[in-house]
Amino acid sequence: MLCGKLPNKPAVFAHRGDWAQERENTIGAFRAAVEAGADGIELDVRITRDGRLVVHHDPLIEQVAVSRMTYPNIPEWVPSLTDALDACYPLRVNIEVKVDDAASGLAMRTVEALNELLRVRAEAPENWVISSFDSRALDHMRFLNSNFRLGLLCWKKPWQPSMEHAVSKGYSALHPHEGLVDAELSESASAAGIERCVWAVSDPKRARGLATAGGTRWITDMPA
């Protein structure tokens, strides 16, 4: 495991599953991450035209927007979110709400469907982390259900506005890209009492440096 011998070992979440073993964001990748001993799994969720939640990173599948496809036309290798969460059990899961066009309303539809799906599952609400680059999606989720942990994704400098926004909104965590993480960010997060979920940690040398800077959770392409 990438950080098995590091000090201040964070919780390790497999980025889209263990896709060194299987195709990313597939049932096989999620099962491989469970077998690899990951602490959790990160995956991406999108909504189809007929309101089904599927796990896929990119906006298109075979040059067609997921949001314009009906579920029966989704390829078999793209899992439904329900099947994906079943494959991830018993690990914690970070569900990223993908937002490509904030004005389209897709993010709100996705969050509403996500809340309906999660609230009837047997796992405790603490099992889920809902993340997004779009704070409006996170705010809508909190309006619908205040029990889920929320994380704001951040990948560009300066990171300070994202940190300030996450703190002011009362989110559980900031999810910075690993290239942004330094002592200043870590100290700022600690002072604000907000968690850091760092993505996507894959280089062992960089991992050693990040271990010094700290982080509550790492999302990594190398869970094993």
Stretches with model-predicted labels:
Residues 1-224:
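Phosphate-group recognition and catalysis centered on beta-loop-alpha active-site segments
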